[in-house]
Curated annotation (Swiss-Prot):
It comes from the Bacteria. Homodimer. GO terms for molecular function: ATP binding; histidine-tRNA ligase activity. GO terms for biological process: histidyl-tRNA aminoacylation. Pfam families: HGTP_anticodon, tRNA-synt_His. This is Histidine--tRNA ligase. The keyword Kinase does not apply. Belongs to the class-II aminoacyl-tRNA synthetase family. InterPro entries: aa-tRNA-synth_II, aa-tRNA-synth_II/BPL/LPL, Anticodon-bd, Anticodon-bd_dom_sf, His-tRNA-ligase, HisRS-like_core, HisRS/HisZ, HisRS_anticodon. Its main location: cytoplasm. GO terms for cellular component: cytoplasm.
């Protein structure tokens, strides 16, 4: 027997039993972001490797360890996108979307990172992202956070999320702090773990994000970033906090919050939850005012966020917040007897034309009515329409309600639509 071919480790199928949850989440995301007036953009899943090296930073874990990179037949180095912001910025520069313009965009799709697969975190994962270009004030920072807060309310998980907030200051302020942090870390080098020692010179801010308790204890005595902020940074952060206070959105200022990518400045934020076991991030974002220029465009302020849909759906399932997801079939048409197959198929087409929101499935493959009714129940249809030879001859149809305590009735085909109209209510 030939060896069975299986999916690649960490890249999972989304089966028919799972897709209704995904569709519900994606529909909620689309509805909310559209209510803010944002437009969808779609980018390719493969980009030139140097895009991510320049955008994310060559000494980040993503670029050093996690990217799926390969050479194509022309010898070009290509990479499956590990995140969406870099590709979105590239597309906006290439097509002239951001020069002296304001843009508010969103996207959703698969991303790829060669990480150790674990629950809610996979090598192919799906990300919903929002990016805004051309706006500098704390008002747009607040709008994105308000948008995410609205998403949690719509999904019924607001009470299980906590907003963590920080500012990284300007690039000059961050550079000054970086030097001070390196000096401090050098004084404690022998006490740092191998990972922190590696990052100490290449990306010292990432040491602040360590999970090692011993290093965390050392960092309690490290210089703080706030000591290096000027008035502009302080005013921006104060303005953001005032807007969030006015909106009633609670937050925790976390001075150790730096995010995992090099391009952030000023505002950074994460939504975290304890509902997935150890505290985990379900959404993160921040400002990246220098990235457009860094990738070859004109200097353009920008801010965005992204959330992983696998972690979000896992959270919904864990908290049992998945409810009122409709079945995939409204009407199941059962047919048995001479001439009923044609009548059933034509009736189904008529219903799809006149009630396009109805999901109509016709039974195929023959079998008696008992077998067909079992199938109707298995697909969780709400109504079965039964066509026998008598019904076809008299241009009638028998209506059987499968989920409601309503008596079965036989009606003229012309009277069927008003009965089915209540399915859309």
């Amino acid at each position: 027997m030939a060896k069975q071919i299986q999916a690649i480790r960490g890249m999972n199928d989304c089966l028919p039993e799972q897709t209704p949850v995904w569709q519900m989440v994606e529909a909620t995301l689309r509805r909310v972001v559209s209510s803010y007036g944002y437009s969808e953009i779609r980018m390719p899943v493969v980009e030139m490797t140097n895009l991510f090296q320049r955008a994310i930073g060559e000494v980040t874990d993503v670029v050093e360890k996690e990217m799926y990179t390969f050479n194509d037949r022309n010898g070009d180095s290509l990479t499956l996108r590990p995140e969406g912001t870099a590709g979105c910025v590239r597309a906006c520069i290439e097509h002239g979307l951001v020069y002296n313009q304001e843009r508010r965009l969103w996207y959703v799709g698969p991303m790829f990172r060669h990480e150790r697969p674990q629950k809610g975190r996979y090598r192919q994962f799906h990300q919903f992202g929002v990016e805004v270009f051309g706006l500098t004030g704390p008002d747009i920072d607040a709008e994105l956070i308000m948008m995410t807060a609205r998403l949690w309310r719509e999904l019924g998980i607001a009470q299980f999320t906590t907003l963590q907030l920080n500012t990284l200051g300007s690039s000059a302020e961050r550079a000054a702090y970086r030097d001070a942090l390196v000096t401090f870390l050098e004084q404690h080098k022998e006490s740092l773990d191998e990972e922190s020692q590696r990052r100490m010179y290449s990306n010292p801010l990432r040491v602040l994000d360590t999970k090692n308790p011993q290093v965390q204890e050392i960092l309690q005595h490290a210089p703080t970033m706030a000591d290096y902020f000027g008035e502009e940074t302080k005013a921006h952060f104060s303005g953001l906090k005032a807007l969030l206070d006015a909106a009633g959105i609670a937050y925790q200022v976390n001075e150790r919050l730096v995010r995992g990518l090099d391009y952030y400045n000023y505002t950074v934020f994460e939504w975290v939850t304890d509902s997935l076991g150890a505290q985990g991030t379900i959404c993160g974002g921040g400002r990246y005012d220098g990235l457009v220029e860094q990738l070859g465009g004109q200097a353009t302020p920008a801010i965005g966020f992204a959330m992983g849909l696998e972690r979000l759906t896992l959270m919904l399932e864990t908290l049992e917040q998945i409810r009122n997801i409709p079945s995939t079939v409204d009407v199941y048409i059962c047919m048995a007897g001479e001439g009923t197959l044609t009548a059933g198929l034509l009736l189904a087409e008529k219903l799809r034309s006149e009630r396009p929101q109805l999901r109509v499935m016709t039974h195929c493959g023959g079998g008696n009515f008992k077998k067909q009714m079992k199938r109707a129940d298995k697909v969780e249809a709400r109504i079965a329409l039964i066509l026998g030879e008598t019904e076809v001859a008299e241009q009638k149809v028998t209506v059987k309600f499968l989920r409601d305590q309503v008596e079965q009735q036989t009606v003229d085909v012309t009277a069927l639509l008003p009965i089915l109209a209540q399915l859309g209510e």
